[in-house]
């Protein structure tokens, strides 16, 4: 790629959010490296980058894998402030993690001072159907409440992992286009007010 082409590569800041052990790191590494990491090693903070072609547009995904443990809540808020889009993850094998996702959603909304922000909801570990505690319908209903896309995924089997990340980039793009449109309308309204005053 030429340096001129690289200068126009749009970067998207994505934050992985969910309780400890839901598979945030496994999902991220599966997306970045097409590898499943079996052992659980609690993350404090890891950052990954991947260039993708999404809907014929190049995108650089800057993915921040955050700590799920409560003691890192203050650090997580800093990441939330800077994130453009969020992958909210729970494990279908743990209802507690589903409840935590709702608390994390509230935390993001408070930190960003926004009711709606680009996000996708992911029920991970769909390969463990025999251990399911969270019905698919509960995830679907929560996503409808949040007005976001919902995916049941498996980091282990690489099921719908790419769909979730690409879906989030589409949401970020849509949100940015809406902001630009509103700003343009506001600017035009201000310009017309200036003309009237003169």
UniProtKB/Swiss-Prot annotation:
It is a lipid-anchor. GO terms for cellular component: plasma membrane. GTP binds at residues 18-25, 65-69, 124-127. A motif (Effector region) lies at residues 40-48. Keywords: Cell membrane, GTP-binding, Hydrolase, Lipoprotein, Membrane, Methylation, Nucleotide-binding, Prenylation. It is an enzyme of class 3 (hydrolase). One of its GO terms (molecular function) is GTP binding. The keyword Lipoprotein applies. GO terms for biological process: signal transduction. Residues 196-198 form a propeptide. The keyword Membrane applies. Alternates between an inactive form bound to GDP and an active form bound to GTP. Activated by a guanine nucleotide-exchange factor (GEF) and inactivated by a GTPase-activating protein (GAP). Its EC number is 3.6.5.2. The modification Cysteine methyl ester is found at residue 195. It comes from the Eukaryota. It catalyses: GTP + H2O = GDP + phosphate + H(+). A lipid is attached at residue 195 (S-farnesyl cysteine). Transmembrane segments: none annotated. Belongs to the small GTPase superfamily. Ras family. This is Ras-like protein 2. The lineage of its organism: Eukaryota, Fungi, Fungi incertae sedis, Mucoromycota, Mucoromycotina.
């Amino acid at each position: 790629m030429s340096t001129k082409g690289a200068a126009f590569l749009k970067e998207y800041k994505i934050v992985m959010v969910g309780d400890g052990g839901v598979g945030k790191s496994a999902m991220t590494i599966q997306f970045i490296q097409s590898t499943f990491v079996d052992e659980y090693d609690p993350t404090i903070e890891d950052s990954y980058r991947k260039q993708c072609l999404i809907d014929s547009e190049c995108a650089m995904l800057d993915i921040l894998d955050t700590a799920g443990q409560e003691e890192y809540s203050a650090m997580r808020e800093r990441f939330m402030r800077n994130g453009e889009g969020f992958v909210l993850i729970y494990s279908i094998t743990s209802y507690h993690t589903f409840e935590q996702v709702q608390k994390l959603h509230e935390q993001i909304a408070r930190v960003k001072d926004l009711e709606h922000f680009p996000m996708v909801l992911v029920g991970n570990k769909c390969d463990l159907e025999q251990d399911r505690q969270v019905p698919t319908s509960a995830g679907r209903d929560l996503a409808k409440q949040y007005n976001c896309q919902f995916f049941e995924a498996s980091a282990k089997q690489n099921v719908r992992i790419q769909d979730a990340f690409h879906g989030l980039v589409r949401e970020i793009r849509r949100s940015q286009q809406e902001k630009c449109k509103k700003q343009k309308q506001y600017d035009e309204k201000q310009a017309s007010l200036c003309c009237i005053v003169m």
